[in-house]
């Protein structure tokens, strides 16, 4: 099965997302998918809170005249803005945009709050819905008209040095987040022609999907003083002088959820990282005539024991065990524990790992400790697999001074190996003309094993 078919199929079968809503590019998070989203963004919120970011919530509606202040930035998506033009039947004097992003709303308010250097740094974030009138082919959780999970952080600083340090913190924070949800990535400095409009520069996280295409899953932008000058974000320095603040912004969206689903899935279904799994352990009673009560009493006891540390479900549906195995493999539940009369007689239980399919017999008397060990191994294995997956999709090609020869070499590597092609960095081919020659996207300048490369790939 092709990846795109698998992806659409698994969103439905695993109860992740329903795209049958009657607006293109808008869908519904189903309960199981929403829990994956919730646990994932809890990790992200924790990382932000621990680094002194404050969560807030700004309005969704933006007056047209305020949005227009973004100038160069708004040109990047002015054709994608949704507009509210009426209040009931009454035309509005000023059109209102549905939030495509929040620079204008946040920076308008920051101007009210930032007066002196002691008000800095200011580090705010929110998790909100944003709207883009995507005209390209929409894809669930990947390319949406209503992005339902947009985490955007915006910071303001007194000095360029503090601003640069914030970029480093944001990159480390995002790296830790993607490591936690077992999504592999490379980090690139986007080329000038592909940076965030209005930014000094953009750093981006890209992951690789099973079909060899890359997906941008996070961005970090150094805005310098560009937006501050537009929005008159001035403050009084310790010397009593006036200066503009230095700013950063960085975002992660539903693509993080799409990626943790896509990267580790297999022909059986999802393989979910433990920390974001809605159900971490499923218990399956193996019932035999005359032994039902013994088995159910024991497995209910096990349920109570494990629930002290894990999210556990006891599947007591009146269907065959094989059907239950299939259902929970599709949903990617990390561990399955089976318990039948013979297991009880022997003082044992059978644990099955979703990531490897390995079946492990453990002593029932020590089951909590055994489960903790296996969960730890599961987590480590998924992280190792994540690293392997992206390394297997990286290909380094030798540099050629002849641009046409180099482009043919890159195209051949993309055709043969797919994934990300790394070219030793050289300014002579770091341009849009070369991007057109190779019929792929230049991700940017990437450091790999201590060397600088131009990274190129076919992208979503």
From Swiss-Prot:
<dbReference type="InterPro" id="IPR036621">
    <property type="entry name" value="Anticodon-bd_dom_sf"/>
</dbReference>
<dbReference type="GO" id="GO:0004827">
    <property type="term" value="F:proline-tRNA ligase activity"/>
</dbReference>
<keyword id="KW-0648">Protein biosynthesis</keyword>
<dbReference type="InterPro" id="IPR002314">
    <property type="entry name" value="aa-tRNA-synt_IIb"/>
</dbReference>
<dbReference type="InterPro" id="IPR006195">
    <property type="entry name" value="aa-tRNA-synth_II"/>
</dbReference>
<dbReference type="GO" id="GO:0006433">
    <property type="term" value="P:prolyl-tRNA aminoacylation"/>
</dbReference>
<dbReference type="InterPro" id="IPR033721">
    <property type="entry name" value="ProRS_core_arch_euk"/>
</dbReference>
<dbReference type="GO" id="GO:0005737">
    <property type="term" value="C:cytoplasm"/>
</dbReference>
<comment type="function">
    <text>Catalyzes the attachment of proline to tRNA(Pro) in a two-step reaction: proline is first activated by ATP to form Pro-AMP and then transferred to the acceptor end of tRNA(Pro).</text>
</comment>
<dbReference type="Pfam" id="PF03129">
    <property type="entry name" value="HGTP_anticodon"/>
</dbReference>
<dbReference type="GO" id="GO:0017101">
    <property type="term" value="C:aminoacyl-tRNA synthetase multienzyme complex"/>
</dbReference>
<protein>
    <recommendedName>
        <fullName>Proline--tRNA ligase</fullName>
        <ecNumber>6.1.1.15</ecNumber>
    </recommendedName>
</protein>
<dbReference type="InterPro" id="IPR015264">
    <property type="entry name" value="Pro-tRNA_synth_II_arc"/>
</dbReference>
<dbReference type="InterPro" id="IPR017449">
    <property type="entry name" value="Pro-tRNA_synth_II"/>
</dbReference>
<dbReference type="Pfam" id="PF00587">
    <property type="entry name" value="tRNA-synt_2b"/>
</dbReference>
<comment type="subunit">
    <text>Homodimer.</text>
</comment>
<keyword id="KW-0963">Cytoplasm</keyword>
<dbReference type="InterPro" id="IPR004499">
    <property type="entry name" value="Pro-tRNA-ligase_IIa_arc-type"/>
</dbReference>
<dbReference type="Pfam" id="PF09181">
    <property type="entry name" value="ProRS-C_2"/>
</dbReference>
<dbReference type="GO" id="GO:0005524">
    <property type="term" value="F:ATP binding"/>
</dbReference>
<comment type="similarity">
    <text>Belongs to the class-II aminoacyl-tRNA synthetase family. ProS type 3 subfamily.</text>
</comment>
<dbReference type="InterPro" id="IPR002316">
    <property type="entry name" value="Pro-tRNA-ligase_IIa"/>
</dbReference>
<keyword id="KW-0030">Aminoacyl-tRNA synthetase</keyword>
<keyword id="KW-0436">Ligase</keyword>
<keyword id="KW-0067">ATP-binding</keyword>
<dbReference type="InterPro" id="IPR004154">
    <property type="entry name" value="Anticodon-bd"/>
</dbReference>
<keyword id="KW-0547">Nucleotide-binding</keyword>
<dbReference type="InterPro" id="IPR045864">
    <property type="entry name" value="aa-tRNA-synth_II/BPL/LPL"/>
</dbReference>
